[in-house]
Amino acid sequence: MIQVENLSKSFGSKRAVDDVSFSVERGEILGFLGPNGAGKSTTMRMITGYLPPTAGVVKVGGHDVAEKPIEAKRLIGYLPESAPLYTDMTVEGFLGFCAEVRGLGGADKAKAIDRAIEMCFLKSVRHQSVDTLSKGYRHRTGFAQAIIHDPDILVMDEPTDGLDPNQKHEVRSLIRRMGQSKAIIFSTHILEEVEAACTRAIIIDQGKIVANGTPNELKDKSELANTYLVSINGTEAATVREKLGSVIESAKVTIVNDKPPAVLARVFPKDAGSDGALGQAIFSVAKQNEWNVNEIKKEQGRLDDVFRNITLSDTQTR
């Protein structure tokens, strides 16, 4: 549904987006991650036709955005960052205006307004003036205009920015529901949103794609993936390190906490395929030494760890 090929954008001598390529299919929810200034918003503006690229091609539903902008934009619902609204209109009036711009009229227009209001939980403010809405309701109204014409593709720039936890949960749930039948891309710097809503994620840094995969595939890149945390009462940290290190061949053992009452050790697998055997070996060592074990827990990788490792060098050079 969305094909981005060798996309670049320069502002003067600054290369904001540098040779970016990726695709998003129907049924996919792509999270576009990156630090501030990485090129997320610029890329999304080029996808929607709001900003022309310096080089490269964007195709939406098979239509080149530069050559057939009207055909491409018919398929897109766009929620820009800080979505502009006509504050002198009511919510219903604004959505009606957006529906007409999208070519809807009569019964189709009325159905589209009702549907968007219901999906975005706007019923209680339907007849309220936009300028009296809270930030959360304004954001929902912006979301509603993006889906008013039931587009096949949704492009959203920071869709939960500024919302409270309950509102964020509502928006993520809505994205997941719509993602079953649409191609969705949304930018964020909130890592928990990727795990909560996305089927795939891209990390962009200094205008370049530096990682691309499912949330689990990205977490597997973490140095903590498939490690084990072992919590033990009444045993010296040095003893724990020695026993685990000597019995579990070349697996690395680090002490996370050596203060009473519990020693906390992290045990790293020798290789990616040894984590199952590693868990069994840890249990055997604990049993043989009659340790008072609080917990043996296998750790999943952490997106924040992967994100930090990938983007840290750029942060240090800014």
Whereabouts are the PLM-identified features?
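Hydrophobic/anchoring residues in structured secondary elements
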Residues: 9, 127, 253-258, 298
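A short linear hydrophobic-aromatic micro-motif
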Residues: 121, 169, 249-255, 292-296
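Short loop or secondary-structure boundary microenvironments that flank
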Residues: 62, 69, 234, 271, ...
